[in-house]
Amino acid sequence: MSTLDRSIQARARAHLFGLLRAGFRAIPLSDATRDRWRSWFLDRHADWVPEPVRGRANHAISRRPTARSDEAAIGHVAYRTTALPETLPATLVAFYLPQFHPIPENDAWWGKGFTEWRNVSRTLPQFEGHQQPRLPADLGFYDLRTPDVMREQARLAQEYGLGAFCFYFYWFAGKTLLEMPITQWHADTSITLPFCLCWANEKWARRWDGRGHDVLIDQAHSADDDLAFIAHVARYMRNPKYLRVGDRPLLLVYRPHLLPEPVQTAARWRNWCRDNGIGEIHLAYVQGFERPDPRDIGFDAAVEFPPNMSTPPSVTARQRLVNPDFSGDVFDWRELARDMEQRPLRDYTLYPGVNPGWDNEPRRSGKGRIYLHASPRRYRDWLARTVQHRLANAPSAHRMVFINAWNEWAEGAVLEPDARLGYAWLDATRQALTRAPDVATEICSPSACVVLHAWYLDVLDEMLDAIVECGTPLRIIITTDLTKVIEVTKCIQRRGIQAEVEGFENRGRDILPFLHVANRLLDENVQLVLKLHTKKSTHRDDGNAWRGEMLTALLGPQRVDAIVNAFSTDPLVGLAAPEDHLLPVTEFIGGNADALDYLTVRTGSDAPDTNSLFASGSMFWARLEALRPLLDAHLHASEFESEQGQIDGTLAHAIERFVGLAVTHSGHRVTTVEQTLGITKTPSAQPYRYARKAP
């Protein structure tokens, strides 16, 4: 077949697929029937699904890591211990993949020594901001044949609030694969973390999702196989640390409709367990491909399995491609979280699920299905809202949340510490169990903080005078170059000022240090921050006037209390800057168009329009919650250019123009200091003194 013929055939199939999909969606069907028909079609005709839209291959500057792939990002969290409540509000159960040790079958199918780490380590970023490869941190590229690995996993899981692991169990008509870690967990009395099993009852095929005809090992369901299966797993269910619902061992099945007769299978399992000393069991299935009422198939409950059964809007077309041939799908993970946390529970027993991200590019090179913009803080909120709201009326025995997953490294669903963010995902898990994300707290002076970047130390005293003389006690954090920490410390000691001093590499001007500090303050529940820096432009002769105008507007006598109160009384105010220095982004974009485009795509924010404003000079009051689109992007320091005295066109200059966009994307608004104070000013007819409009 010629290339032209194949192209015509592909277009015809895509057109037919669109017609079939439209008709399928128009037919009134139950969720269970619709899911079953969809799975049947895709199992047989996966090649009919049209190619996804492509991203953008041509952009001015390439922005991807060039030196190393294990750099810690803004928001990296170190290991830390925190006491958990004696009684947790829910049992968190994380799915656990045991494919981190070699087995003969994988040696034969994928090459000698294959484990999931081979997929993980080969991965390359497909577009800018694509965080690949994702590499492990403290646990390393572990081998589950080493008992201490699983002991450490159990310890971490318990310290960070998890209640159990759910191991994938692979059974093929009497043959098991990857069972060794489960056997090891079962036998190790030093491990006390509960566990349960999920029978991953698909065939194994060359395709990552089990579809297709190149079958590696198949299932052979029968009545005898049902009995052999339950007899095999019974030894695990007899273990005192096996997870129970009430007093019933919990057994999951991944795809129940692959069982020829699920009702009869469930009955056989129940009868065998009653006859062999197990007693009653609690059967649940995973809503990965289908959503029947569990009672209709002889089961007791269902388990949500995000991101499956949810398709947020595609953001593929926006991506700035590194690989021009990338043909995968990119979705907005935040929309997944928003959708799932608002879903009501069903009239049957349904255990809700959450997900810390998804990216199966390691298994599908150049064709991954990627959920972009996942962040530990947003995952924390999703998990907390699930526990507090979706489970609000659940009986105590059913207060379980399933997390997909603990260690799906090749699918980007991981709680274990990684090189980029450290323990952030585990820390967010623990926070979700110990804090209420939706409780509004009144902003008052102690929750307001000044972050002052001191580069030009000859004006530091002037800046400190303005802070001290504002009349409101404020927490002060001073950032500076590593070489200037001692001098800054001496200055504040000489003046008798209480301030924290933090040193940073001279990169990213005042912006990068501010992002580091703002991220930490947000985690400390500080609500409001005043961003300042020792503004003194070497390329202008009016830098002192610029600095003075902004200090007067932001810190003038009796202003600070009024500004803080304005943020407190109006929760939609996200940023306030001096009116004379709040400018339209599109008119002062300068040489920052490409970097600004990168930031909007990287953060999943809208591109600037004529209403978009920025604080020229980068001094402003801001609600830290309103900066989350920028902070939750977890930029790397290496993305900021080395300091060479640039006056425009760097990532720091672009972020100056982007901050307002982040605020509006978060659902807040940008306003002027004067408006928050009720001051009416006549707009100046003179051109802005301190920057030139774009031509």
Swiss-Prot record:
InterPro entries recorded: RgpF, WbsX
Pfam families assigned to the protein according to its UniProt record, in alphabetical order: Glyco_tran_WbsX, RgpF
Signal sequence coordinates: none
Tree of life domain: Bacteria
CDD domains tied to this protein: Glyco_tran_WbsX
Record protein name field: Uncharacterized protein WxcX
Species per Swiss-Prot/TrEMBL record: Xanthomonas campestris pv. campestris (strain B100)
Organism taxonomic ancestry: Bacteria, Pseudomonadati, Pseudomonadota, Gammaproteobacteria, Lysobacterales
Gene coding for it: wxcX
